[in-house]
């Protein structure tokens, strides 16, 4: 039966605002004030069902009754709201029983609380938008004043628009197009300029050995290398002290930012043309290597960062390949400093984002602009690192085609000495079908490389040390590693193959941390928690030390790191296969002590059988010695190879293989970095023959072949690096005997390798 007062009754049931000041509590004021002070959380109806139960013929009470919730009820409701702001019927009934409230009282409390939070957020956002609008209006007024007071640079009189020649008109159109893009980026950057950086990257001078750097490890999700915690720091290892570049750069000033934006736009245009243009900019030589025509380059790009400084040598290379990763995830890797330094940990020894000028638009990185600094290395103590201070700019050019460019900001650095600078360098990424992408990489560097050891100069001059081929080869291998780690259809034909997804993920995460830790001690970087002790005479053994405390990923105590590089007249592939083979391990590994080495577990990491993670067991001939496990990762690509290993605890590895957390497994990695010597040019299908990057040029090919060198294609540059715990007490003093022992160990290993590979006189 229809009752005319029924809907009026329901209206009063939902109306929480007192109609007059004569309520039971004496609450006065407007609805908004009542909402602000009571927030619907402290005041509610005494019996919300009372009006529905009234006789429909009776008039509803005009005066509704309210009562306050107790302090305990409010605390419980607030606590539950933080966990679940939208409780279901079952949860509301449970709360009503616990707090002695009606279910509808609980329901209305949550409704009012959500409304209050929404209103507070809207007011806060409105205040921010109003502040930004005021800033834009003020900036617009400054521009108007500047235009009204503009003067002619020639005569000093008022500026006037006169007749333009045909060429001048075209220049003005081109300038207008570039200015439009600059204004668009500036408008985006205006929203973010001046925002404080994250706590762990707020200021360079404050970085020290006690500075906490979050660990980054492979998260095994497409496009998510490392824990993306939005940190602006990307370290392969911990930072110890300030290197030259850390002392010479700072966050750019407000006056510098318009110039940075303009430079980034010009660099993007240059990179796209460098990646897509052939002759006469890139000239092909007889051995299919492209040489950059510097005269044509400066004629084509008269703008940019200026002429080449005296004393610097140009390196330019270009390389293309197809990788098994979609373009969106590739862009994310390049624009996130943590993921970038993790994926390229063998090249990037340290990276920092100084300031994010723009985060992009439309929920992606289109238009993203950030000022960065990075240190690039070769896995050898004999090759100095290269430090750059640059801006990185990402732009979508068309549907499915993106570009990321770096260009140095040396003009903003107070340091008068420039040892290395990046002309527009980066990559074009083209979307392909089935989740693949085509990557065209351009590296254009000007560097003072006179400090490079003579043994490594041929490698550096071919472009394999820092050129585009090394970047592309590393990216291709890492994409294969990620794709292999995510495979679900693993055949169980081999008992040593790990088929459990959880076990594979944990073991790969542990291996990745081992590789990254190895890279901190193998190169010439000084930006990590190592103190260099000495380089011992003609043997060129670089010894460093560090104290490990409160780090679950490393054993506590004093750790020594020793590294040395030498040349052997053996092809890189033969050296790589010898060092990664467990059957030949006893020929060089003192830890195996002549025992039988057996592979217990295995994870393939790509097409090449040399790319894998293995768990080895050393069965010592001494019955009194317990068996030992060794975690090993071997990887190879067209630019070089690694064999990295570390002794691990048996109990801890059982936890890892069961899918447990690998971050608490203590590791001290040792291993080898194998590079071609740069002497072979062309033929043989070798890694160094296909380097394709000369002093001024680089090769281009759609496919990167794996290392397939033969004995006739030149020798190898082998770097051996050990990390050894010499004292389990972190506060103990380092003894000279410990240094001598580590030196003896590394020399003995080198001699064993030379003898096993028959390198007499090497």
UniProtKB/Swiss-Prot annotation:
Matches recorded under Pfam families: Homeodomain, START
Keywords, ordered alphabetically: Coiled coil, Differentiation, DNA-binding, Homeobox, Nucleus, Transcription, Transcription regulation
Record keyword rRNA-binding present: no
Spans through the membrane: none
PROSITE patterns recorded: HOMEOBOX_1 (PS00027), HOMEOBOX_2 (PS50071), START (PS50848)
Domain of life: Eukaryota
Main location: nucleus
GO BP annotation list: cell differentiation; cotyledon development; plant epidermal cell differentiation; regulation of seed dormancy process; regulation of seed germination; seed germination
DNA-binding region residue numbers: 62-121
Basic residues bias: start-end ranges: 60-71
UniProt domain START: residue ranges: 253-484
Compartment(s) of residence: Nucleus
Mutant lacking the gene: phenotype: Plants missing both PDF2 and ATML1 have reduced levels of L1 box/ gibberellic acid (GA)-regulated putative targets, including LIP1, LIP2, LTP1, FDH and PDF1, in the presence of GA and during seed germination, thus leading to a delayed germination upon imbibition. In plants missing HDG3, HDG7, HDG11, PDF2 and ATML1, increased cell division leading to cell overproliferation.
Signal sequence segment: none
Expression triggers: Stimulated during seed imbibition. Induced by gibberellins (GAs) and repressed by DELLA proteins in an ATML1- and PDF2-dependent manner. Upon seed imbibition, increased GA levels in the epidermis reduce DELLA proteins (e.g. GAI/RGA2, RGA/RGA1/GRS and RGL2/SCL19) abundance and release, in turn, ATML1 and PDF2 which activate LIP1 expression, thus enhancing germination potential.
Protein family per UniProt: Belongs to the HD-ZIP homeobox family. Class IV subfamily.
Protein name according to UniProt: Homeobox-leucine zipper protein MERISTEM L1
